[in-house]
Amino acid sequence: MSKVYVFDHPLIQHKLTYIRDKSTGTKEFRELVDEVAALMAFEITRDLPLQEVTVETPVGPATSKKIAGKKLGLVPILRAGLGMVDGILRMIPAAKVGHVGLYRDPETLQPVEYYVKLPTDVEERELIVIDPMLATGGSAVEAINCLKKRGATSIKLMCLIAAPEGVEVVKEAHPDVDIYLAALDEKLNEKGYIVPGLGDAGDRLFGTK
């Protein structure tokens, strides 16, 4: 069964307060999301395997460590997931970036894939699916489906804020995918928004309505 991790680092929680604040403007909101994504990347990579190597310093040889195992890949869900990519790349600059685009069918209300572009070696990478909000869980489940259909076997989900309903949907659909959050909020309202949440992450990132 998948595990859920909520990061309580003081810097993450401090910045998340300003992200939630409706008076925070687009520029500051964008910068804060970027910063929190970078901090979350630090936390989500704590379990990466290491191997010992020997390097030459200006003084002499040194035994040190470097990351081993699968290479990393980032997969933002369009469009709001894009706001978290640069912050993560600052921490993991060698990661390749794919994209998954989804829209909601007006009749069935189910997410439909309209764009998928992934690294050619997804089966050899540990992929981090990125979306600021995990509300109903439908988009996250479908994005993970897209990756698995193309051969991905090692996947994590990173979101700023989640509703319990969305977390349970993802856990049921993908029990092999761990979920990493900055906050787990109270519930969804009748419109499917996370309460208290932060509003529409995409609109606040890109200055749209």
From Swiss-Prot:
Catalyzed reactions per annotation: UMP + diphosphate = 5-phospho-alpha-D-ribose 1-diphosphate + uracil
Indicate how activity is controlled: Allosterically activated by GTP.
Residues binding 5-phospho-alpha-D-ribose 1-diphosphate: 79, 104, 131-139, 200
Q: What remark does the entry make about the cofactor? A: Binds 1 Mg(2+) ion per subunit. The magnesium is bound as Mg-PRPP.
A GO MF annotation of the entry reads: GTP binding
Biological pathway: Pyrimidine metabolism; UMP biosynthesis via salvage pathway; UMP from uracil: step 1/1
Instruction: Fetch the NCBIfam families from UniProt.
Output: PRK00129.1, upp
Q: Which family does it belong to?
A: Belongs to the UPRTase family.
Q: What is this protein called?
A: Uracil phosphoribosyltransferase
